[in-house]
Amino acid sequence: MNNRKVELTRKTRETDIKIKLNIDGNGESHIDTGLKFFDHMLESFSRHGFFDLEINVDGDIEVDDHHTIEDTGLLLGKCFREALGDKRGINRMGYSIVPMDESLSTVAVDISGRSYTVFNATFQYQYIGDVTSQNIKHFFESFAMTSQMNINIKAEGENDHHICEVIFKALARSLNDATKITHNQILSTKGKL
């Protein structure tokens, strides 16, 4: 198995981000985005996907959370894309159904080289902790764009925290399955992903 680890940075006038990712990790994480609820979601993502993940963000959260969440999604997606290399041997697709109390999420991914996001979930309130709820969808769109994955998300429930958390957990489990190396082929009739 190739070494599927990567360390990348992204620096703009709005954010300064450093991410270390080990796809074949143990679910260990150190996350500091400046947004406690977002940290909690990314920690859940790391734990349930068995990805080792370090994220440090210095973002303009005095403005709002948009740039921090968007740019973290962009860089994390790029980390996955680079760590997977030519994608030889991976399952390519994965899905998961995750419950949490009254909430349920189904997430399916295809590491196809084509970016697309379907997000079928709604939140009752404008904020979940210190995060604007509309930026949750934007995180997944940003992640899908740079990872070049198709991500299809469906979630329902009554508690916004639970809905958001089951989405992150279901994505993690889906990606854990999709990134597993189980053969020596590139699963595409084109010969590349």
Curated annotation (Swiss-Prot):
Q: In which pathway does it act?
A: Amino-acid biosynthesis; L-histidine biosynthesis; L-histidine from 5-phospho-alpha-D-ribose 1-diphosphate: step 6/9
Q: One GO biological process from the UniProt record?
A: L-histidine biosynthetic process
SUPFAM superfamilies reported for this sequence? Ribosomal protein S5 domain 2-like
Biological source species: Methanosphaera stadtmanae (strain ATCC 43021 / DSM 3091 / JCM 11832 / MCB-3)
Q: Which InterPro entries match?
A: IGPD_sf (IPR038494), ImidazoleglycerolP_deHydtase (IPR000807), ImidazoleglycerP_deHydtase_CS (IPR020565), Ribosomal_Su5_D2-typ_SF (IPR020568)
Family assignment? Belongs to the imidazoleglycerol-phosphate dehydratase family.
Please give the catalytic activity noted in the UniProt record: D-erythro-1-(imidazol-4-yl)glycerol 3-phosphate = 3-(imidazol-4-yl)-2-oxopropyl phosphate + H2O
- State any GO CC term: cytoplasm
Tell me the protein's name: Imidazoleglycerol-phosphate dehydratase
Q: Which residues cross the membrane?
A: none
